[in-house]
C-alpha cells in the first residue's frame, strides 16, 4: 500500500535583508525560523543579504583604497559581504541539525550579462540547487 502525502512539499524561497541578519543573534533567529519551516515539511531556498551595514562599509573601504572603482571589482567586493552572511547562516543551520550549502549567484545557476553593478539575468540553471535540495541540504 502506498502512502500519499496529504499536503505536497512546498518549495519556499525566503529572503532576509541586512537588518534581519545584522548580528549573530539575528542570524540564529532566522535559522530558527527556517528550521521550523523545514520541520513543517517544506523545502527552503534561503537568500540573505550582507549583514547590517556591511555593504556600506565595503563601499567606504573601496573609496578609501582607490579613486577608481572598476565595475567587476566592485561586484566582487560587494559579494564578499553576502558570502560572509551566507556562510554564517549555513553554520547556524548546521547547529540546528539542518545541513545547508551556500551558493553564490553563479554557483546557483544564474547567468547574467556583463553590465557590472547593474547586471540582468539572462538564464537560470538551478541544477546544483536542485541536487542540494534533493539531498536534504
Task: Identify the meaning behind each predicted range.
Residues 1-137:
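Nucleotide/pyrophosphate-binding catalytic subdomain
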Amino acid at each position: 500500500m502506498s502512502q500519499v502525502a496529504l499536503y505536497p512539499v512546498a518549495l519556499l524561497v525566503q529572503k532576509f535583508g541586512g537588518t534581519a541578519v545584522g548580528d549573530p543573534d539575528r542570524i540564529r533567529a532566522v535559522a530558527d525560523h527556517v528550521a521550523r519551516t523545514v520541520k513543517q515539511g517544506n523545502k527552503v531556498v534561503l537568500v540573505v543579504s550582507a549583514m547590517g551595514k556591511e555593504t556600506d562599509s565595503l563601499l567606504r573601504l573601496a573609496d578609501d583604497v582607490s579613486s577608481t572603482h572598476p565595475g567587476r571589482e566592485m561586484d566582487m567586493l560587494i559579494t564578499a559581504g553576502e558570502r560572509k552572511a551566507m556562510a554564517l547562516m549555513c553554520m547556524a543551520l548546521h547547529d540546528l541539525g539542518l545541513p545547508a550549502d551556500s551558493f553564490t549567484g553563479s554557483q546557483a545557476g544564474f547567468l547574467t550579462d556583463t553590465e557590472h553593478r547593474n547586471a540582468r539575468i539572462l538564464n537560470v540553471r538551478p541544477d546544483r540547487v536542485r541536487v542540494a535540495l534533493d539531498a536534504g541540504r
